[in-house]
Amino acid sequence: MSSERVLSYAPAFKSFLDTSFFQELSRLKLDVLKLDSTCQPLTVNLDLHNIPKSADQVPLFLTNRSFEKHNNKRTNEVPLQGSIFNFNVLDEFKNLDKQLFLHQRALECWEDGIKDINKCVSFVIISFADLKKYRFYYWLGVPCFQRPSSTVLHVRPEPSLKGLFSKCQKWFDVNYSKWVCILDADDEIVNYDKCIIRKTKVLAIRDTSTMENVPSALTKNFLSVLQYDVPDLIDFKLLIIRQNEGSFALNATFASIDPQSSSSNPDMKVSGWERNVQGKLAPRVVDLSSLLDPLKIADQSVDLNLKLMKWRILPDLNLDIIKNTKVLLLGAGTLGCYVSRALIAWGVRKITFVDNGTVSYSNPVRQALYNFEDCGKPKAELAAASLKRIFPLMDATGVKLSIPMIGHKLVNEEAQHKDFDRLRALIKEHDIIFLLVDSRESRWLPSLLSNIENKTVINAALGFDSYLVMRHGNRDEQSSKQLGCYFCHDVVAPTDSLTDRTLDQMCTVTRPGVAMMASSLAVELMTSLLQTKYSGSETTVLGDIPHQIRGFLHNFSILKLETPAYEHCPACSPKVIEAFTDLGWEFVKKALEHPLYLEEISGLSVIKQEVERLGNDVFEWEDDESDEIA
């Protein structure tokens, strides 16, 4: 090097942001920060011992652990505190006055540095995260400041200080959080002290540059603070310490005596924005959509819109309880298909279909999970496979099973007993049961079993231009109030409604939009219900939790109704529950073959007899009145 020159500087760091950094930023933005764009702390551990030979600066590696307050450092690593400002809108990021922003950060470093010279080093990242496209815009800045008077105009080599290099390196290894040290009157390396350096005039700085005889721009920060502490200092000795080879010593001269030694808000030049890969002073853009696992992207994207609800509209919405709910769909037809699509849109991950039918040629146009090639194949398995094609991380299962129906005589008792056992096991394994089958009698056994297992039931049923959506009231021993089930309005036990029906009665003849309306309301009722552990609560963060919703398309009206449980209900009355508890399958078998048996157990037969007696009394009274008139 020449005998005398103006001191020049190299960039402080070269940034490397790992994909895990952006993934953690995405998680924090969605789940924690939301609309908060204020400063968030970062921590980086610099490895100054293992710098690649091809690198001109120390790599600044940022990973998901950079967001941790206590980022565990390894031996000889140097901790560095920084921050990130993640903007909500791309235009905010673009229109930010970058120079003013960096100047403000430099003033913060200056204010920290005049209290402790080791605190005048930091870094900052400004960013915008496009979470839909997985594109991240960011720019790293390392605030490097220099007051006019602290410009080093003359530097000359000082070979006599080379013997201090190893001592300084060892001192920095022990004092890993320090960036500067000084030489005292006894030629010992000690912590920075402005009273001592005023006399010895020897300053050693830890360096992050690898360029020969060119220190990093961070040196300007330390020299500015040094001159503030010792305003009359002109000539001094400067040691640039690198943990590997390349340390050097200089005789240095400040441009002038500091005229602003008492100023805490000095006039200073600030630089530090990192250049991009093209060598331009501009932000960088990272597109992770092609780098991340598509399944990981799908998993996060499914929850994106749901989590955005919590940013502004519903901050108290509990999405985890919905996501972790295990749902059983009894019926994989029109209702089952639409309900399942609404469930996965709400983030439900576990769905089991139960159906014993196959896809007919009339189904694909109305049942959203099937297409023409599926005709003739089992519905339940196909529905589960279709959900997995839509979202591969779904835990979807299809079970081909015939639900034993009341009023239908046993054909194969062994097989139907197995179906009963399997159905009861499925109901036990799931949290919410949707009854989406196409006959009243097929709803009886699931209603009974769900009541026995105290499971929440959501019922959806269709008419030509009407629909019913209702939830069954769970048994609550602490409350005398219990809502009615699907059968609580019946005055007779369910019977065979499928035999001897014409074609228009066997097929589901409804206005096509009715199924979609009922399905969506059924799922929305479930999500509202899940927001509170008390099924009888009137409102949640999502609003009301009605018992029944009845819709009529002929005048486009909706009614919300509530009815209590009926003490003689053939599905949920205490006597029916008691009989099933005592007899199990034997009770079910008798009820299937002899509906009148169920009426006797529930007490409906007594009600029928009383009604008939009252009717006879009325007729006798009318006959007496006629005789008198005559």
From Swiss-Prot:
Belongs to the ATG7 family. GO terms for cellular component: cytoplasm; cytosol; extrinsic component of phagophore assembly site membrane; membrane; mitochondrion; phagophore assembly site. Gene3D superfamilies: NAD(P)-binding Rossmann-like Domain (3.40.50.720), Ubiquitin-like modifier-activating enzyme ATG7 C-terminal domain (3.40.140.100), Ubiquitin-like modifier-activating enzyme ATG7 N-terminal domain (3.40.140.70). Changing residue 466 to A: Loss of interaction with ATG8. This is Ubiquitin-like modifier-activating enzyme ATG7. The gene is ATG7. The active site is at 507 (glycyl thioester intermediate). GO terms for biological process: autophagosome assembly; autophagy; autophagy of mitochondrion; cellular response to nitrogen starvation; cytoplasm to vacuole targeting by the Cvt pathway; macroautophagy; mitophagy; nucleophagy. It holds the Pfam family ATG7_N. It comes from Saccharomyces cerevisiae (strain ATCC 204508 / S288c). It is found in: Cytoplasm; Preautophagosomal structure. Changing residue 490 to A: Loss of interaction with ATG8. InterPro entries: Atg7, Atg7_N, Atg7_N_1, Atg7_N_2, ThiF/MoeB/HesA, ThiF_NAD_FAD-bd, Ubiquitin-activating_enz. One of its GO terms (molecular function) is Atg8 activating enzyme activity. A motif (GXGXXG motif) lies at residues 331-336. Changing residue 486 to F: Loss of interaction with ATG8. The C-terminal 40 residues are required for homodimerization, as well as the interactions with ATG3, ATG8 and ATG12; and the C-terminal 17 residues are required for the ATG8 lipidation. Keywords: Autophagy, Cytoplasm, Protein transport, Transport, Ubl conjugation pathway. Changing residue 511 to A: Impaired homodimerization and ATP-binding.
